[in-house]
Structures are given as C-alpha cells and as structure tokens.
Amino acid sequence: MKASMFLALAGLVLLFVVGYASESEEKEFPIELLSKIFAVDVFKGEERGCKGFGDSCTPGKNECCPNHACSNKHKWCKVYLGK
C-alpha cells in the first residue's frame, strides 16, 4: 500500500515536471524550476555582516551574530545562553 502511494506521488511529480518542461523554452529551466519550487533564489549568495553558528571567529572581536558568542576554546560562534 505504501509503495503504490509512493509510486503514484512520484508519477504525479514526474508528470508535472514533464508538462512544465514542455511549455518552457528557456535554457535555464532547471534553475528556474528549483527557484519556483523553493520560492527562494538560492543561486545568488547572500552576504551578512555577522557570523552564524559554527563559523570561525576570533575571540574578543564581536564578529558573531546577536545571541551568539565566540568560543575561546574552539574559536567558532556558538549560541550564547546568558551565563
């Protein structure tokens, strides 16, 4: 039962992709399709002024984003719990 439902869903997705591909004449079809599916332009890098969780940092320079702190031991940004 689960396998037949999975195959039916996969078939519908494949039908949607093939139908959309037949209408699209642009060469950038895969990028366009992915950006429409996820509704985010993931192919253009987004820069931010602070470093997030797990990014390397230098202790004492305050490079990490708000609610994060640079670990003296590991030298990467971690979540600051307020202690």
From Swiss-Prot:
InterPro entries: Huwentoxin-1, Huwentoxin_CS1. Disulfide bonds join C50-C65, C57-C70, C64-C77. Its main location: secreted. Lethal neurotoxin. Selectively blocks tetrodotoxin-sensitive voltage-gated sodium channels (Nav). Does not affect tetrodotoxin-resistant voltage-gated sodium channels or calcium channels. Keywords: Amidation, Disulfide bond, Ion channel impairing toxin, Knottin, Neurotoxin, Presynaptic neurotoxin, Secreted, Signal, Toxin, Voltage-gated sodium channel impairing toxin. This is Mu-theraphotoxin-Hhn2j 1. The modification Leucine amide is found at L81. Monomer. The lineage of its organism: Eukaryota, Metazoa, Ecdysozoa, Arthropoda, Chelicerata. Expressed by the venom gland. The keyword ATP-binding does not apply. It is found in: Secreted. The keyword Signal applies. Belongs to the neurotoxin 10 (Hwtx-1) family. 15 (Hntx-3) subfamily. One of its GO terms (molecular function) is ion channel inhibitor activity. GO terms for cellular component: extracellular region; host cell presynaptic membrane. Residues 1-21 form the signal peptide. Pfam families: Toxin_12. The presence of a 'disulfide through disulfide knot' structurally defines this protein as a knottin. Residues 22-48 form a propeptide.
